[in-house]
Amino acid sequence: MKILRLLTVLVIAALTFAACDDTTEEIGGSITNKIDNINISNSAFNVTTKSIVADSVLSRNNMGLIGKMKDPETGNYVKGDYMTQLSVLPTFDVDTLDYIKQANKGSIEADSCYLLVSYNASYGDTIAPMKVTAYEMTKPMSEDKEYYSNYDAFKERWVSENNQHWSSNYNLSNTSDVKNFKIYLNKEYKKDGKTYKNYGSYIMQTYAEHPEYFKTNFKFLHNVCPGFYIKNVGGTGNMAKIWNTELIFYWTRHKTINKDSTAVSIGYNRFDGTEEVLQLNKIENDTENLKKLASKYQEKCTYLKSPAGIFTEVTLPIEDIMKGHEKDTLNTATISFPRLNNDNEDNPYNFATPSTILMVQKDSLQSFFEKSKLADNRTSYTASYSSTGTYKNAYTFQNIANLVSAMYKNKGKGENWNKVVLVPVNVITTTQGYTTVISKINHDMSLASTRLIVGTDDPDKDYTTDKVTGKKVASGPIRIKVIYSKFKEE
């Protein structure tokens, strides 16, 4: 029963403290439960932050970006290209080839072939004219290595500008529920000394000769279609968030019913970019401009910008938190990062505020994504942007006590032992029955940006004096608020 009462006291104290305003926090007093002989105290400590330029992020994402536009807040240009491979089902089949031959004087031909590029979000001026080119890959990019968003498929010779390619002009003004644009692959296609009517005819004739190439993704990628590199080659003003790229080809079939009658019909096949094969984003940011931006406003704010833009580094005052409390239990540690509104909030072209951010130890940032880890609420956490409530217009981590304790145990092990990084992420969930769980955390590859109030710890500016105790109390713009508990000494 005593354990139960102890847990009850701690929970109530945590909830009470979480709702405290700044004045209450600065009292820094203690609450005593005489029955259970437990002493619970609270305190707050200043936290410092700064912007760090990401340079590149792991490009393992099902979403692609295509286009080029200017960040209205910073003036920085962002350009997106992507590589996609296509998946084939083991049951793939082309309709009765004899009927297709009858429609094409004995030849197996596709009437039309195109890449259907589908997007679920657009940024910028949707009517801005854009131009894209699809290059057939020279060879499939390897699945046994990691690629970052600054990878150069041309330099690494995965693809060449001399490869066969197809271009398309488009805009993003499509107002239907299903948004897409097409890149037609209808010009002559040449391979191994043979000329085909179009890329679809190449696919169909290859299937007729080697159906075994279509049984697995590996065989298909290495013998038929190594994928496409989709590159923005013209236009500035918008970007599209691509959720699927399909290769679709149509054909006509003639079936003789009797001597005087022939049934004419149209058929088609498709290959999709799926999770079973690679989709890789290539992001071009003006890195030098980002570095200037990060340093120019360092005293005012920090940034969260995606894709592959700017993160916020946080230095936690671990030693101060634990000083004098080495033998106490650290029950809760809450920290909130307030957002600064844009100078022009009404600009329709402003990038969206990142919806979710990850807090992860700085030295574990790279391995977290490469090893496909999930936030464990011990050394890594996620927080969603809140526009209402107690912590309005902020990202709040309700309890990182486990992280503080883990850092204290590793005190001094490496220069980043007390540092974490805030990173915009995309959280993917799956639902089984009535339970929804996080299944994947990727870098956010959408166009998102926000400024956070900078955390400082100036002895002359970021402290006040408690009127009762006369002690200095942290009053900086970002504070970590903690609750300790211990048994009272007899």
Which residues fall in each region the model found?
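Secreted, disulfide-rich extracellular signaling modules
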Residues: 2-490
